[in-house]
Amino acid sequence: MKALTARQQQVYDLIRDHIEQTGMPPTRAEIAQRLGFRSPNAAEEHLKALQRKGVIEIVSGASRGIRLLMEDETGLPLVGQVAAGEPLLAQQHIEGFYQIDPSLFKPGADFLLRVNGMSMRDIGILDGDLLAVHKTQDVRNGQVVVARIEDEVTVKRLKKQGNMVQLLPENCDFQPIVVDLREQSFTIEGLAVGVIRNGDWI
C-alpha cells in the first residue's frame, strides 16, 4: 500500500473526523471548503488518489459516498521534529501513519523518521527522506543508527571504543560527532533499516 502525501493525509483526516462528529462522510464541496480547494473537483481528485492507494472506497452515485478502508493509527508512525528532552515516539512528534508493511524491512521497522540535512548523502539518505528504523539498542560498530546526544537526535554511522563514541557522517562536508560517555548523555534510539525517498513509497 502506498504512503499518503501530506495533503492526502489531511483529506483522509478530515473525512475520518467528519464521520466521527456527524456520523456521515463530508461532501466534495465540504472538503473543498474546509481545506481551501478551488472547487469540489479538486477534492474529487484527492479522493480518487486515496482510493488508488487503498485507504478509501468511493461509492458512485452518492454525494457522501465515501467509505474508509483503513483503521486509524495503523501502519508505521512518522516522527517529525523532536522536542528537546521528550521521547522520540511521544504523541506530539508523530505526524501521521504510513500504510507500509514493517516486514518489508529486515529487521522489521518500528517507525519512520523524517531526515533533516545532507550529512548521510553519500549512502543515499537525503534531506526530506523517510528513514525506516528498527527500535533497538543492540547495535554494532559500522551500522547506521538513530542516536540521541543530550537533546539532539541524529542519524550517523556508529563507531564506539571504550567510553568514546564517534558518529560518522557520509558526506565530506560534515565532521564526525564525538561523544564522551563519561560526560554526555547518549542513547541509541534505533537501527536504520531502509529509506523511502522524499515520502514516496514505491
Swiss-Prot record:
Active site, renumbered: 119, 156
A Gene Ontology biological process term: SOS response
Origin: domain of life: Bacteria
SUPFAM superfamilies assigned to the protein according to its UniProt record, in alphabetical order: LexA/Signal peptidase (SSF51306), Winged helix' DNA-binding domain (SSF46785)
Residue ranges the record marks as coiled coil: none
Keyword DNA-binding: yes
Site for Cleavage, residues: 84-85
Residue ranges of DNA binding: 28-48
Alphabetized UniProt keyword annotations: Autocatalytic cleavage, DNA damage, DNA repair, DNA replication, DNA-binding, Hydrolase, Repressor, SOS response, Transcription, Transcription regulation
Gene Ontology MF terms: DNA binding; serine-type endopeptidase activity
One Pfam match: Peptidase_S24
Reactions catalysed according to its record: Hydrolysis of Ala-|-Gly bond in repressor LexA
Enzyme Commission number, as recorded: 3.4.21.88
Keyword set includes Transmembrane helix: no
Description of how the protein assembles with itself and partners: Homodimer.
Similarity field: Belongs to the peptidase S24 family.
Function: Represses a number of genes involved in the response to DNA damage (SOS response), including recA and lexA. Binds to the 16 bp palindromic sequence 5'-CTGTATATATATACAG-3'. In the presence of single-stranded DNA, RecA interacts with LexA causing an autocatalytic cleavage which disrupts the DNA-binding part of LexA, leading to derepression of the SOS regulon and eventually DNA repair.
NCBIfam families found in the cross-reference section: lexA
Record-given protein name: LexA repressor
Organism of provenance: Edwardsiella ictaluri (strain 93-146)
Lineage, top ranks: Bacteria, Pseudomonadati, Pseudomonadota, Gammaproteobacteria, Enterobacterales
Gene name in the database record: lexA
